[in-house]
């Protein structure tokens, strides 16, 4: 792969992180740098780690991962999105607010948005990337791009969501976005391959 192809691949992989970050930013409502950095770091780390894991185990597990990666990503995103949608219809007084900055949610979203990156790692092995020095550059670029796009998405979501989040039912739209990403992953794998 050329350098340009790796950067374009990194941007493509980071789009799910970007969309989830926008949804999370809408819910956060105000700039909170610590949770924003933790979220962006988690997304970047998992986007870098998953291709490495996929690359390491490609020869042994590729047929298993390729057959279910889209279902795993869809299930996780649909669960999180469905939960957010349901919570958006509860009364304000009795509702537990969905917290996209909680460690459990960040971890789950980071895994869900990086499942495709696992498959990319498998394809790296199939493309002939054979040693650690060759895989290092692509995974660092993928992690960096995902980190930056996640921060931008969070900031954008916060700025768009400020003042109008209540009127727009931010949790409803955030949930719809997560379910849509899950459906996109599922449709791409079932019908476009």
Curated annotation (Swiss-Prot):
Keywords: Cell inner membrane, Cell membrane, Ion transport, Manganese, Membrane, Transmembrane, Transmembrane helix, Transport. Its main location: membrane. The chain crosses the membrane at residues 8-28, 37-57, 61-81, 109-129, 138-158, 172-192. InterPro entries: Mntp/YtaF, Put_MntP. GO terms for molecular function: manganese ion transmembrane transporter activity. One of its GO terms (cellular component) is plasma membrane. The keyword Cell membrane applies. It comes from the Bacteria. It is a multi-pass membrane protein. It is found in: Cell inner membrane. This is Putative manganese efflux pump MntP. It comes from Bacteroides thetaiotaomicron (strain ATCC 29148 / DSM 2079 / JCM 5827 / CCUG 10774 / NCTC 10582 / VPI-5482 / E50). The gene is mntP.
């Amino acid at each position: 792969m050329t350098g340009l192809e790796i950067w374009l691949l990194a941007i493509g992989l980071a789009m799910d992180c970007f969309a989830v970050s926008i949804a999370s930013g809408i819910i956060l409502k105000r700039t909170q740098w610590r949770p924003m950095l933790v979220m962006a770091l988690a997304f970047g780390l998992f986007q870098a780690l998953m291709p490495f894991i996929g690359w390491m185990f490609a020869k042994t597990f590729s047929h298993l991962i390729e057959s279910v990666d889209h279902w795993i990503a869809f299930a996780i995103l649909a669960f999180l999105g469905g939960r957010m949608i349901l919570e958006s219809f509860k009364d304000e007084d009795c509702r537990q607010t969905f917290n996209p900055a909680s460690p459990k949610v960040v971890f789950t979203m980071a895994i869900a948005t990086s499942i495709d990156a696992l498959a990319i790692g498998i394809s790296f092995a199939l493309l002939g990337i054979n040693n650690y020095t060759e895989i290092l550059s692509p995974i660092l670029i993928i992690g960096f791009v995902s980190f930056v796009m996640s921060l931008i998405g969070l900031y954008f979501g916060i700025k768009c969501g400020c003042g109008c989040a209540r009127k727009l039912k931010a949790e409803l739209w955030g949930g719809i976005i997560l379910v849509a990403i899950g459906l996109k992953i599922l449709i791409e794998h079932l019908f476009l391959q």
